[in-house]
Amino acid sequence: MSQKKVTVRQVGSPIGRKPEQRQTLQGLGLNKIGRTSELEDTPAVRGMIRKVSHLVEVVGE
């Protein structure tokens, strides 16, 4: 059984953000504006996206 995937793109800078938000972006595999990352659609990943929703956008589900 294959997991569903979710693709996220970084649209905001981590400069001046809290360390927790920087670490969350790194956990999502993002480090520069415009980069995308394809991740498995799990509750943990959804929670991470929700934590930094002002810095990322969901491109595809």
From Swiss-Prot:
Xref: SUPFAM superfamilies: Ribosomal protein L30p/L7e
Region (Disordered): 1-20
UniProt keyword Ribonucleoprotein present: yes
GO cellular component: cytosolic large ribosomal subunit
CDD domains: Ribosomal_L30
Keywords assigned: Ribonucleoprotein, Ribosomal protein
GO terms, molecular function: structural constituent of ribosome
BP-aspect Gene Ontology terms: translation
Family: Belongs to the universal ribosomal protein uL30 family.
Subunit-structure text: Part of the 50S ribosomal subunit.
Name listed for the protein in its UniProt record: Large ribosomal subunit protein uL30
GN (gene name): rpmD
